[in-house]
């Protein structure tokens, strides 16, 4: 069993898709842009909220208009990020069991730092030893910077780490960090894509994830 487990947030621990979609469409409506479907937003997420909005606005939208939409999104999502969001089945229990086993637990997310911390504190109080979201001056995933920051802050080494995520971005993050990777199939990407990165495992339930992590 690894000493430190770092989790992605959206699509791994929490199903945040409906709140993200609602905030995206609220922001798009502010400029009378067409709304996006849940499946479209699913494909847009993973690289941070700025890229989510850049992908959601119509092609050819002037940068200044994209900036306005992004501002509306950030303001709305900050107040509406926990309306429909729910933990995936079995995740809360799995985290408690890992904590009881003495594991250090962290979150590294491309979600903005403030809402990432607020959401984790709300849904998983007193569970995580570190939560790091997107901040200015720190490269977001798949760059390994926030992973390295977490490893150092918790007094661990890369060899003591397993990274858990649900996307190609997460697989690339683990590869760039040089650490073990487990991917979950219940998130925002198809299983075939996840398997193409040859992770240590692709799991389908929280119970399977727990078994993989405590081996």
Where does each model-flagged region fall?
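Asp-based, Mg2+/Mn2+-dependent phosphohydrolase catalytic module
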Residues: 1-3, 113, 117-215
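Active-site neighborhood of HAD-like aspartate-dependent phosphohydrolases
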Residues: 2-43
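Generic enzyme active-site microenvironment
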Residues: 6-8, 108, 164
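Substrate-recognition element of Asp-dependent hydrolases with the DxDx(T/V) motif
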Residues: 24, 91-121
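Alpha-helical substrate-recognition element adjacent to the catalytic core
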Residues: 30-60, 89
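Short beta->alpha linker loops
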Residues: 44, 48, 86-90, 111, ...
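Metal-dependent phosphoesterase signature
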Residues: 54-93
